[in-house]
């Protein structure tokens, strides 16, 4: 799934985000679904907080992306994984857990691609 991201988008990433993106791809290829969700939001946060992006990313595009339903869902889902409060879907250890995590990882992948497209299109 992650192989279809335009290489031009990758060139826009700072060195830290590039390393995270490489690990993200490895996690996706190895079905490490929780890691995919965590890394996808980490990459997005890196992009949104990199002041060098202000030279070529439109502020309206940033606001549009930050107000998206998928971006908010990903932040909530990532926080549920990292900050345990109670058992959450995908972590019950039953036969549907892996399926749930995979579906969520695919949605996280879609959100990351959307971030690349919205912020780095020309």
Model-derived features with residue positions:
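Short, hydrophobic, well-ordered secondary-structure elements
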Residues: 25, 30-51
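Short, charged/polar, low-complexity loop and linker segments
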Residues: 24, 58-60
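Amphipathic, well-ordered alpha-helical segments in soluble domains
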Residues: 16-20, 39, 46, 77
């Amino acid at each position: 799934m992650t192989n279809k991201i335009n290489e031009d988008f990758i060139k826009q990433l700072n060195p830290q985000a590039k390393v995270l993106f490489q690990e993200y791809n490895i996690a996706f290829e190895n079905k490490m679904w929780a890691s995919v969700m965590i890394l996808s939001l980490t990459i997005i946060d890196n992009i949104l907080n990199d002041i060098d992006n202000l030279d070529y990313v439109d502020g309206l595009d940033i606001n549009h992306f930050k107000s998206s339903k998928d971006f908010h869902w990903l932040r909530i889902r990532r926080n549920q994984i990292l900050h345990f409060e109670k058992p959450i879907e995908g972590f019950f250890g039953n036969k549907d857990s892996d399926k749930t995590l995979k579906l969520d990882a695919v949605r996280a992948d879609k959100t990351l691609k959307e971030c690349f497209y919205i912020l780095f299109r020309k």
